[in-house]
UniProtKB/Swiss-Prot annotation:
Residue ranges of the region described as Disordered: 35-120, 303-330
Native organism: Paracentrotus lividus (Common sea urchin)
Motif OAR, chain ranges: 344-357
Keyword entries, A-Z: Developmental protein, DNA-binding, Homeobox, Nucleus, Transcription, Transcription regulation
Family: Belongs to the paired homeobox family. Bicoid subfamily.
Protein name listed in UniProt: Homeobox protein orthopedia
Chain intervals with Low complexity compositional bias: 303-315
Length: 364
């Protein structure tokens, strides 16, 4: 071994380098191989470019061999050539110029194809006008129509197809939002408030304050009733028999006992005032007339005497009962739009008013 090292003095440097990087086993193998080459003499140049492999990580040789050093090009010494080679298992191969070429984990990203960048198609006004004109004709053009449009506007068929898809989505979205606010019936009832009559409507009450046709009949009726009422009524309960609208309006509506003439006059005036009072006056009249009218007409007409008549006439009467006469129609008609709370009271009031009309015929 000493003789071999003496013949090859340049191997000392490479041996020291391999002791540091590759390990003792690897160094011994390389030294023996170099000694054989030096004894032969003629094989030095032939075997100078071979790579010696070592098993520095596993002495039993179970792992695959890795290059222990670099390959020196042109000097015949393994690991030489100006800094070629790394340690055992380093995977670096020296090229003799001081540069090492890596062979692991390099250049994988360059193999992937570059992702194609999508660009946005910009339509000219002429192209948009042509596309909109065809969209007005049909929303779903076939392949032949799309190709024809693409030739006219200078686009590809796929671009035309995508434009029609986007345009259909936009049209459906706009249609969905406009259908909600197009008609008020979608949010409000279609009839609105037309079925409820306004308080100032003329059809709400047929008898007006300016119509004085019913006053002569009322005044005549009260004059016939006056003698019967004076015999059995106190002086503080005597009604004012003026027979006009002014006297009827001057009476307080909250007297506990009133005559039939006064109550009828107040009822007719209240009917004429229905334009200003509205639904509240009518509801008060219909609700108050249910219980008070039952005690007024309890006695029968056949056996009615002057005393019973006066007691019946002096009983409390509803303040807002509308009166009907055979000569003048004073009924307050309400539009029958489905108001169930008025239907029952109107039928009962109609029967009571017929009873009042029969009493009017008796006094005449």
């Amino acid at each position: 071994m000493e003789r071999t090292l003496a013949h090859v003095p340049s191997m000392e440097l490479s041996t020291e380098a391999l002791l540091v990087t590759g390990g003792l086993d690897n160094t011994n193998k390389m030294i023996s191989s170099s000694a054989v080459r030096n004894d032969d003499g003629t094989m030095i140049s032939q075997h100078s470019d071979k790579v010696s492999y070592g098993t520095s990580g596993a002495p039993d040789g179970s792992t695959p061999p890795y290059p222990a050093g670099g390959v020196g090009e042109g000097n015949g010494i393994v690991g030489g050539g100006g800094g070629g080679g790394g340690g055992g298992g380093g995977g670096m191969v020296g090229d003799g110029t001081g540069h090492s070429v890596g062979s692991s984990g390099s250049g994988n990203d360059d193999d992937k194809p570059a992702k194609q960048k999508r660009h946005r198609t910009r339509f000219t006004p002429a192209q948009l006008n042509e596309l909109e004109r065809n969209f007005a004709k049909t929303h779903y053009p076939d392949i032949f129509m799309r190709e024809e449009i693409a030739m006219r506007v200078g686009l590809t068929e796929s671009r035309v197809q995508v434009w029609f898809q986007n345009r259909r989505a936009k049209w459906k979205k706009r249609k969905k939002t406009t259908n909600v606010f197009r008609t008020p019936g979608a949010l409000l009832p279609s009839h609105g408030l037309a079925q409820f009559p306004s308080p100032m409507n003329d059809s709400f009450c047929n008898f007006h304050g300016q119509d004085t046709r019913g006053w002569p009949a009322m005044s005549g009726m009260t004059t016939h009733m006056a003698p019967h009422m004076t015999t059995h009524m106190p002086s503080h309960q005597m009604p004012l028999m003026g027979g006009g609208p002014g006297s009827a309006l001057a009476l307080p509506p909250s007297l506990p006992r009133q005559g039939l003439g006064q109550s009828m006059q107040q009822q007719s005036v209240n009917c004429s005032m229905g334009q200003t009072t509205g639904l509240n006056t009518l509801s008060m009249g219909t609700n108050g007339s249910m219980g008070s009218m039952t005690s007024m007409y309890q006695p029968s007409l056949g056996g009615m005497t002057t005393g019973s008549m006066s007691s019946g006439l002096s009983s409390p009467s509803p303040p807002n009962l509308p009166v009907t006469d055979s000569s003048t129609d004073l009924s307050c008609s309400v539009s029958d739009a489905g108001d169930m709370w008025r239907g029952t009271s109107i039928a009962s009031l109609r029967r009571k008013l017929e009873h009042a009309a029969s009493l009017n015929g008796i006094f005449r």
